[in-house]
Amino acid sequence: MKKGIHPENYRPVVFKDMSNGDVFLSRSTCSTKETIEFEGETYPLVKLEISNTSHPFYTGKSKLVDTAGRVDKFMSRYGNRMKK
């Protein structure tokens, strides 16, 4: 790697997929205050809503991901109309 062109905080970081609990180690400049112990070392933790281990394109399975209650909100507004 060339000197002086990479950010100073480029370091190993653990990413955790919150939809299935999968964790993996990579390098990143993401800033976070959370840490996790992974393979005997302590690393910064970045939480992901979806990753390649849970995304339908990579898994081949369709899955509903409701991160902000959008489906519940829709069903409370329009759910009764569909049943008629």
Swiss-Prot record:
<keyword id="KW-0689">Ribosomal protein</keyword>
<dbReference type="InterPro" id="IPR034704">
    <property type="entry name" value="Ribosomal_bL28/bL31-like_sf"/>
</dbReference>
<comment type="subunit">
    <text>Part of the 50S ribosomal subunit.</text>
</comment>
<keyword id="KW-0687">Ribonucleoprotein</keyword>
<dbReference type="Pfam" id="PF01197">
    <property type="entry name" value="Ribosomal_L31"/>
</dbReference>
<dbReference type="GO" id="GO:1990904">
    <property type="term" value="C:ribonucleoprotein complex"/>
</dbReference>
<dbReference type="GO" id="GO:0003735">
    <property type="term" value="F:structural constituent of ribosome"/>
</dbReference>
<dbReference type="InterPro" id="IPR002150">
    <property type="entry name" value="Ribosomal_bL31"/>
</dbReference>
<dbReference type="GO" id="GO:0006412">
    <property type="term" value="P:translation"/>
</dbReference>
<dbReference type="GO" id="GO:0005840">
    <property type="term" value="C:ribosome"/>
</dbReference>
<protein>
    <recommendedName>
        <fullName>Large ribosomal subunit protein bL31B</fullName>
    </recommendedName>
</protein>
<dbReference type="InterPro" id="IPR042105">
    <property type="entry name" value="Ribosomal_bL31_sf"/>
</dbReference>
<dbReference type="InterPro" id="IPR027493">
    <property type="entry name" value="Ribosomal_bL31_B"/>
</dbReference>
<comment type="similarity">
    <text>Belongs to the bacterial ribosomal protein bL31 family. Type B subfamily.</text>
</comment>
